[in-house]
Structures are given as C-alpha cells and as structure tokens.
Swiss-Prot record:
Biological role stated in the UniProt entry: Effector cytokine of innate and adaptive immune system involved in antimicrobial host defense and maintenance of tissue integrity. IL17A-IL17F signals via IL17RA-IL17RC heterodimeric receptor complex, triggering homotypic interaction of IL17RA and IL17RC chains with TRAF3IP2 adapter through SEFIR domains. This leads to downstream TRAF6-mediated activation of NF-kappa-B and MAPkinase pathways ultimately resulting in transcriptional activation of cytokines, chemokines, antimicrobial peptides and matrix metalloproteinases, with potential strong immune inflammation.
Keywords attached to this entry: Adaptive immunity, Cytokine, Disulfide bond, Glycoprotein, Immunity, Inflammatory response, Innate immunity, Secreted, Signal
GO terms for biological process, alphabetical: adaptive immune response; inflammatory response; innate immune response
Protein name from the UniProt record: Interleukin-17F
Family: Belongs to the IL-17 family.
Subunit structure comment from the entry: Homodimer; disulfide-linked. Heterodimer with IL17A (IL17A-IL17F). Forms complexes with IL17RA and IL17RC receptors with 2:1 binding stoichiometry: two receptor chains for one interleukin molecule. IL17F homodimer forms predominantly complexes with IL17RC homodimer, whereas IL17A-IL17F favors complexes with IL17RA-IL17RC. IL17RA and IL17RC chains cannot distinguish between IL17A and IL17F molecules, potentially enabling the formation of topologically distinct complexes.
Signal peptide residue numbers: 1-30
A GO term, aspect molecular function: cytokine activity
Pfam families listed in its UniProt record: IL17 (PF06083)
Disulfide bonds: 102-152, 107-154
Designated gene of the protein: IL17F
Glycosylation (residues): 83
Keyword Glycoprotein: yes
C-alpha cells in the first residue's frame, strides 16, 4: 500500500462529499424565492433542460498534487496493527478502494506479543462512491454508501455477566 493510494482515496472522499454538498445547495437554491434586489444564478433560457436529480460532474481533481501528511508506518506501529488490501470494482468511482484488516484478535503489548485480554477492532468510516449504471447506450453514475475499514484500534473486551 502506497502513500499515494491513501492520498487519492482521501481526496476522492472529499470530492464525493463536495458533490453531495453541491447537489444539496442546488436543491435548496431552487426552492428559495429571491428577495427584491437579490438575484440567484439563473440558467439562460437557451440552455437545454437537465433531468431532475441529475448533475454534470468532471471527475478530474483540481488539487490532485496537494499532499496530506501521513504518519509513517502507523499500521505497523499500532498496538492493534493492520494490513491494507485494495478492492477493485470497475463499475465504481473510485474503482480502487483501500481497506484495512486487523492482523490479530488481541492487541500487541510493549514486548511485541499478542495480549488476548484486549481486543483489536476495526475502525470503519462510511463514505460515498459513485456507482456506474448502464442504461442502453448511456452511462450514468449514482451515489452509493460504502463502509470502509480505515484502521484498527485496541479496546477492552466486552464482558457479559450471566446472572
């Protein structure tokens, strides 16, 4: 797993959140009535109409070269270490999604040994991706929620007392 792949995944998350925000703003702006002297962006009448709920999107990332600093080898240094795997889906944007998988059921102590009295659990983040839909000769994209495991953490185990 490279830092570049992690950076691209993070950038795609932010892009999808921005798309959702823009779609929401478009919807709320359409419902507002401008006050006297106030104007909202209005599409020229010569422009073709766009179907309700659709949005034109350029998938290029404006600041793609901007780097987000990442901690070095955090997945190996954690008391709950994990490995990365890449899932691939050609009908999803992004087509590559990086997932973390916990290495142990227990946590790693200061001596590097697994402590089975603690639990290693996944940290999950719900994110939005674009799902490609084929309709005859045309292709469209629809937002889809995806649960991504981004790392693991060490927790005290749940203890159930039987009475």
């Amino acid at each position: 797993m490279t830092v570049k792949s992690l950076h691209v995944t993070a950038m795609v998350k932010y892009l999808l959140l921005l798309i959702l925000g823009l779609a929401f703003l478009r919807e709320t702006a359409a419902q507002r009535v401008p006050k006297e002297g106030q104007t909202f962006f209005q599409k020229p009448e010569s422009c073709p109409s766009v179907p309700e709920g659709s949005l034109k999107l350029d998938l290029g990332i404006i600041n793609a070269n901007q780097r987000v600093p990442l901690s070095r080898n955090i997945e190996r240094r954690s008391t709950s270490p994990w490995n990365y795997t890449v899932t691939w889906d050609p009908n999803r944007y992004p087509s590559e999604v990086v997932q973390a998988q916990c290495r142990h059921l227990g946590c790693v102590n200061a001596q590097g040994k697994e402590d089975i009295f603690m639990n290693s659990v996944p940290i999950q983040q719900e994110t939005l991706v674009l799902r490609r839909k084929h309709q005859g000769c045309s292709v469209s994209f629809q937002l889809e929620k995806l649960l991504v495991t981004v790392g693991c953490t060490c927790v005290k185990p749940l203890i159930h007392h039987v009475h």
